[in-house]
Amino acid sequence: WLSVEPMQKDSGLFDKQLEDRMPDIQRFFSEAGHSGWHAKKHSGFCRFLTVKKSFRDDTLLVNLTTSGSEVKRFDKAGFTALMQNILGNRLAGLLHTVNDDPGDRPNTTDGTREILLGKPELIESICGLKFRISPESFFQTNPQSAERLYTKALDYVFEKDLGEKP
């Protein structure tokens, strides 16, 4: 928990467009002189970047969580422009949360949140149901797998006699 692996390129696990540009985001904060969060010392500015993806719309919701220590000199407009440049129309929402909780895993609902651009949530669809996804949402990251699981569960629910399944 004390170290962070800097993402330099697409890991194949999430979103190539965003992952390939992570060095640009890191450079933005480094050039501005913003410090990274030091979990052991409970100090620093940049805590984490939470990203949610709607596979239905191919859009992203980005929430930057920082401490309040350097917030007065944080260039919100510059960060917003950078994220728009990186994601274009795929950026559905950009949020900035200031959280000074010294804990290792601060609750993202604590602190103050500002919408820098767009909306504070995404919409995702699974089996025709629509879900509102916020930065705090625990949601299946692979909707296609979730649809298969839901469909299988519904098959079991609507079987007349579960005992006769081959």
Predicted region positions:
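Accessory RNA-recognition modules of RNA-modification enzymes
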Residues: 1-166
